[in-house]
Amino acid sequence: MVNEFEIKKQICDIGRRIYARNMVAANDGNISVKLNDNEFLCTPTGVSKGFMTPEFICKVDAQGNVIQANPGFKPSSEIKMHMRVYQKRPDVGSVVHAHPIYATSFAIAGIPLTQPIMPEAVIALGCVPIAEYGTPSTMEIPDNLEKYLPYFDAVLLENHGALTWSTDLNAAYMKMESVEFYAQLLYQSKLLGGPKEFDKENIKKLYEIRRKFGMPGKHPANLCQNKDGVNCHNCGGACHNEDYKQFPGYQYDFVGKDCDCDKDAAPAADTAKNDAELVAQITKQVMAQLGLK
């Protein structure tokens, strides 16, 4: 039987972690855990995630209605997007939403995390797309999020933040850490002249490692990024899924057919110009997040 009090303590611990790592400010962010098909624990609204204790945690049903909450506490207004994840992904046991500085800066700049630059990111995350903007606390966010749920375990929320989910609370939180670390490395490597991406053969090897590990969750191994026809990266020889065509900024082809994913979609001079603009754009957003001019 699930020990709810222990899970509440775990939620508080993760809340302290995301607060200590500057993934949230003030009362931002929210966390939820699935108990069963109709009972979920979630963080309350209007409370700093760094200072929660177990009695702060609320319980809701599959529609987000309150089952139990202590006086003075009510569920986060963002519980709607958590519920949509659980509805569409029965394998998911926990969802974490935060505003990590680097990942959120990419979300604000409209740049998905899709470049294969680090083994851990390729194995654990694959690509991290951007779900279209939705007004906070409305159904716009879950509605815009829904089409990504069958294929990804992490998304950036346009002009908002990041959302990760996995089989349990710790795994969902670790994905959030991975997303932020990936974003930071990508940003800083751009400052040093641009990241060196893995070639197709190395990507294939990393996908095979993931299969051998039997890692849970979805993984967009057959996703090929070609945002605006400019930055096309190596697809590992597997860039096909007709369903992916619904995602903005991506281009796909059939397995077994010629794939352009190992070719630059723009001349070197144009690519350099785009990289310079990218660095300037992200730097501006990061400085704003840090309160610097």
What does each of the following model-derived ranges do?
Residues 1-293:
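Glycine-rich flexible loops
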